[in-house]
Structures are given as structure tokens and as C-alpha cells.
UniProtKB/Swiss-Prot annotation:
Family, similarity comment: Belongs to the bacterial ribosomal protein bL27 family.
Top-level taxonomic group: Eukaryota
Gene name linked to the record: mrpl27
Primary subcellular site in the record, as a coarse category: mitochondrion
Keywords: Mitochondrion, Ribonucleoprotein, Ribosomal protein
Alphabetized GO MF terms: structural constituent of ribosome
Family annotation (PANTHER family): LARGE RIBOSOMAL SUBUNIT PROTEIN BL27M, RIBOSOMAL PROTEIN L27
Stretches with biased composition (Polar residues): 30-43
Species annotation: Dictyostelium discoideum (Social amoeba)
Any one GO CC term of the record: mitochondrial large ribosomal subunit
Protein name: Large ribosomal subunit protein bL27m
Annotated spans, Disordered: 27-48
NCBIfam families in alphabetical order: L27 (TIGR00062)
Disulfide bonding pattern of the chain: none
Length: 142
């Protein structure tokens, strides 16, 4: 038993028991960081004007991602696919086939203008008042 002599002593046994009694461990695990604690800014997508509603030039009709709605007459499309009015008028929605004979349809947004700029007024110029005026009927485009 000389091999085990000195390995066990009363002092070493006493210290080990005291260490095991006095050691403390965390009773609650510390919280880790999360990657989900933020939100993105709202994009405010969707319809801004409905059917038969009055719009003015430059007013946004719909904000969208991709071409869910396609631009029709008197309507423009921005680089982010926002559809806006080009004239004063009423908004209208329609469905048309993608190509003739197709079952798939596309939705279009158009604006029916209230005013047209192509008004022809025919006037007869009286040449008896001034001698320098030619004897012609003139069409004036306003």
C-alpha cells in the first residue's frame, strides 16, 4: 500500500468537500441576443384611387410590386411599377385576354378624360374689313 500512501489525507478530503459545498452555479441561463428585434418601413402599396373616381395629372392610382395591373390609356407607369394618371378624368378598370384566344387575362387601369384638347372651331373671316386678309376659311385648333 505504499503506492497509495500520501494520496489521501484528511486535509485533502476536507478541502474537496468544502469546495463542493461552496461552489455556486448560475441558476438561470443568461439571455442571448436575437436577430428579430427590428421591423422594416411600411411600403404603402395598394390602390389609392378606385373605379369612377376623379384623378388629376400625376396622381397615383396604384402602387404595386411588379405588374399586377397594366397601364391603359392616359395612364403612365413609373420605374417601381406605380401607375399614375396623365390627364384629368375618371379611373376605370378592365380585363383583357393576354393575346387573342387566350384564357389568361390581364388587368388594365385606364383614365377616361373629362376634357379633350382637340377642339376644332371653324370661323369665317370677313375679308371686307381689311384688304390685306386673304379670302380663306381657316381652321383654328385650340
Amino acid at each position: 500500500m505504499s503506492f497509495f500512501r500520501g494520496t489521501f489525507s484528511t486535509s485533502s478530503l476536507f478541502i474537496n468537500t468544502v469546495d463542493s459545498v461552496t461552489k455556486r452555479f448560475a441558476t438561470k441561463k443568461s439571455a442571448g441576443s436575437t436577430k428579430n428585434g427590428r421591423t422594416s418601413q411600411p411600403k404603402n402599396l395598394g390602390l389609392k384611387k378606385s373605379g369612377n373616381q376623379l384623378v388629376y395629372p400625376g396622381e397615383i392610382i396604384i402602387r404595386q410590386r411588379g405588374t399586377e395591373f397594366h397601364p391603359g390609356t392616359f395612364v403612365g407607369m413609373g420605374k417601381d411599377h406605380t401607375i399614375f394618371s396623365k390627364t384629368i378624368g375618371l379611373v376605370s378598370f378592365s380585363k383583357e385576354p393576354k393575346f387573342p384566344g387566350s384564357k389568361k387575362t390581364r388587368r388594365f387601369i385606364s383614365v377616361a378624360p373629362l376634357y379633350t384638347n382637340n377642339i376644332n372651331i371653324n370661323t369665317n373671316i370677313d375679308t371686307s374689313i381689311d384688304t390685306n386678309v386673304n379670302n380663306n376659311n381657316s381652321n383654328i385648333n385650340i
